[in-house]
Amino acid sequence: MIQDKRDFGERILEYGTGLIKLVKPLLKTRLVFHFCLLPFALCLLTCFSGMASPINPQTTEPNEPSYLTPVEIKLSADGKKLYVLCEDGDSVMAVDTQTKQVVAKATVGHKPKGLAISPDGKTLYVSNEWSDTVTEVDAATFAVKRILKTGWGPVGLVSDRSGKTLYVANSIADSVSLIDLASGAEIKRFVTHRYPEQMLLSRDGRRVYVANILPHLGPYDQPPVSELLALDTTKQVVAERILVPGTIELRHIAEAPPALGGYLLVPLMRPKNLGPLIQVPQGWMMTHGMALIRPATTAPLGVAQSKVTQVVLDDIDYYFATNAGVAFSPDGRRAVVTSSDADIVSILDTARLAQRLREVPAEELANRLDSAVTFVVKRLPTGRNPTSVAVSPDSRWAYVTNRLDDSVTVVDLAQAKVASTIDLGGPKEITLMRRGEQMFHAAKYCFQGQFACATCHPNSHLDGLAWNLETPQLGRDRVANRTLRGIRETAPYKWNGKNPDLATQCGPRIAKYFFRSEGFNAEELGALLTYLNNIPLAPNRHIAPDGQLTEAQERGKAIFFRQSTNDGGAIPMQNRCDTCHPAETHYTARYSTDVKSATKYDTNGLFDIPQLDRVYEDAPYLHNGEALTLEEIWTVFNNQDTHGVTSDMSKEQLNDLIEFLKTL
């Protein structure tokens, strides 16, 4: 007689073991999962669902208090007001720098990410990433003046010196919109590379610089290359595409004062994704630093002649993950850089930095871990997740937004110490989900603080790389990073599908193979899983406001769900799109299959079926990132019809299929 649920579970496991032995010869066919293993899996879930678990994450969207989540900060020209942009508060506020009190607040669009001030200081421009708009706010009254349409996912923005044109970086659209401020209409659009976020107008007003978070799409077995786009504001053309090799995640941009030569400082990350990730020390997995760029403003348009030098901001035995915000003091003596996943702000001596650049060859600087000690004056603690920084006109004070603390850290640059903290008035209760987001951005859980979860998943997304993880056969089974958006109910995890749930994925696995530390305790892991289970999907820009599909999307939908080829031949069930990607389960059947995408470097051909929600944001594709676009999945890597039947399709049909996939 079965005494309790655990005894029953043991019997089920015995039955399952026998069943697997029985069907093992059939595992190469996908249908065996549906008819044999799936019922068994469901039975297991039913039997064990009531068992005690040390980790209890919330898997339903919690009723969260209205956190502010400050992400961007600017100073008025006279230094009397701080303008703070709050991502979750959907607001921009003004803070008096003397009283350190919030004195004004305006409600803007959804998920505001970027903030700019007009040349005359009378108008604030706020980009609303999920509304695809810019809110124009009167800086004196904080009244909303008008709302301007942009491209998809606006983040960074700047006005030209005349105040006539607004430049807006559209992160989802991979573009920059030029908006005529007299009419409020978009007059031009530039194509960028991947996920443009931060922007800067040069001091002379001749150029707008645009930093991209994700690297160029390229061969998965080659080092990444990121890009800083330079736009000519007079001719409104691309002036230069400045390449920054071996890097990803270009963040804020700061321009040095003329006395220092006017070089640009751009925080970045240098991933070491091509070598097996067998350790953390000595910057083995990644380092964090800056690009020093000397723009070639006199070079012919389109000719890349700017000089790029990289320098590491980490120490030999400790790292400062995810450099984000950067600013120079107006007197040029100091530069300030925030490390958002280390909760640190670093004060740099620019004279010593220049000396270091003279002493060490540029080709060495990018990987030298003994540089920062020569020019970092002080590392100061901030609140949680410092993102943006601004320096007062008198070069005395630096103001740092603490994204996950709803506060601003005030730094005394003269004495190199934290002077005070400005409370922006957010909720004091720290919910399980908020705590989980703090865990997600906490590099302290990694050995020597080298990285956090967010370091490889910027914006809770992906980094565009394929990583060479530690596997039994080192150097093989390289896998592409995957997005974390909308991952609830898409288990199992990993490309090999071996992690049955997020607790396994983010608990022992991360501690052993990534952090090389004790990792999270049960309470912390539960909070982290709550956050991961509630990462939302961004609005789908490919669907019309009324939800109706276009004619091309409807045709693509018919192709996705088709059961026969163009000549009337039946498509086997295991080779139909919706067999592996059923609509009712986020377009993933949640098991592994073989579509013959394995290369000679893979030890296994079975790979987890990815979910397709917002798949248009998830390039590169396939388990190793070989397919750079959705089209390449079939035009380059499906010549034998092993990944769905597509060889009979016309180019127009493939285009329609892609159009439908973008609606998911």
Could you tell me what each predicted segment is?
Residues 58-64, 101-106, 143-148, 185-190, ...:
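A short beta-strand motif characteristic of beta-propeller blades
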Residues 62-90:
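Beta-strand-rich domains and repeat architectures in extracellular enzymes and scaffolds
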Residues 77-78, 119-120, 161-162, 203-204, ...:
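Residue-level detector of Asp-centered blade-edge/turn motifs that repeat once per structural unit
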Residues 84, 126, 168, 210-211, ...:
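Residue position within the beta-strands of beta-propeller blades
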Residues 87-88, 129-130, 171-172, 218-224, ...:
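Short, solvent-exposed loop/turn segments at conserved positions within beta-propeller repeat blades
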Residues 96-100, 138-142, 180-184, 232-236, ...:
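Short loop/turn segments that connect beta-strands within beta-propeller blades
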Residues 240, 249-260, 265-279, 286-289, ...:
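Periplasmic c-type cytochrome electron-transfer domains
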